[in-house]
């Protein structure tokens, strides 16, 4: 998941995300099976995407902000997503996800700092994945769990909210907004000129 992100995204977007997808832990992704537009990570994040995000601790205090640039590509049957983060304190970080989608909407995946296998599922305009991550904290690391939700909106923006826990106790919330780097068609999150790989992935 920089101060000037507020000038790029409407101030109310993250508030809307918090209101719309609060209480994620009680939701099931199947509840959104009939919602449009359809969100498939390997379709939406194919090519270039930019995101703006922030992390609040359990007391509601803003701890960190970031901008992330992402590039997604199909490598055989796997979807590889490279994320380059720039945090408001100047720190930079790269994470590379490898996701294996299946026809029933289930996903399995890995990343360098993720513990074990990522488990995810998509339905309708929603995608939920759960994973454990070794998170840098000061000079050490914390092993934390993410319950991560994404929702594709009709204007092509994806709203993201993840609850972060340690030893089963919530320690904070990550909220982010993602937007494609090319214009959308009909506000459905699809680029004006669809690359061949994107068209094939959507079929």
Protein language model regions, located:
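Bacterial N-terminal signal peptides that target proteins for export
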Residues: 1-13
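N-terminal helix-cap/turn-to-beta initiation motif at the start of protein domains
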Residues: 32-48
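Bacterial signal peptide processing site
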Residues: 25-27
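C-terminal motif of bacterial Sec signal peptides marking the signal peptidase cleavage site
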Residues: 20-23
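Amphipathic hydrophobic-ligand
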Residues: 62-68, 141-146, 170-172
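Glycine-rich, aromatic-bearing surface loops/beta-hairpins
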Residues: 147, 151-203
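A short, Trp-centered hydrophobic/proline-enriched beta-strand micro-motif
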Residues: 45-53, 160
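Central antiparallel beta-sheet cores of small beta-barrel/beta-sandwich binding domains
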Residues: 52, 56-137
């Amino acid at each position: 998941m920089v101060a000037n992100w507020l000038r790029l995204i409407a101030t109310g977007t993250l508030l809307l995300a918090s209101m719309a997808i609060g209480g994620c832990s009680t939701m099931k992704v199947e509840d959104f099976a009939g919602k449009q537009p359809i969100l498939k990570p390997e379709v939406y994040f194919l090519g270039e995407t930019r995101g703006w995000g922030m992390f609040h601790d359990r007391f509601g205090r803003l701890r960190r902000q970031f901008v992330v640039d992402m590039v997604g590509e199909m490598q055989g049957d796997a979807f590889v997503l490279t994320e380059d983060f720039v945090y408001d304190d100047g720190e930079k970080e790269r994470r590379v996800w490898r996701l294996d989608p299946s026809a029933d909407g289930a996903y399995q995946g890995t990343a360098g700092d993720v513990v074990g296998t990522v488990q995810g599922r998509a339905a309708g305009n929603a995608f939920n994945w759960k994973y454990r991550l070794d998170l840098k904290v000061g000079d050490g690391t914390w092993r934390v769990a993410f319950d991560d939700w994404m929702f594709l909106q009709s204007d092509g923006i994806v709203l993201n909210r993840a609850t972060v826990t340690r030893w089963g106790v919530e320690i904070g919330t990550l909220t982010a907004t993602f937007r494609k780097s090319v214009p959308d068609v009909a506000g459905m999150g699809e680029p004006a000129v669809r690359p061949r790989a994107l068209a094939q992935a959507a079929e």
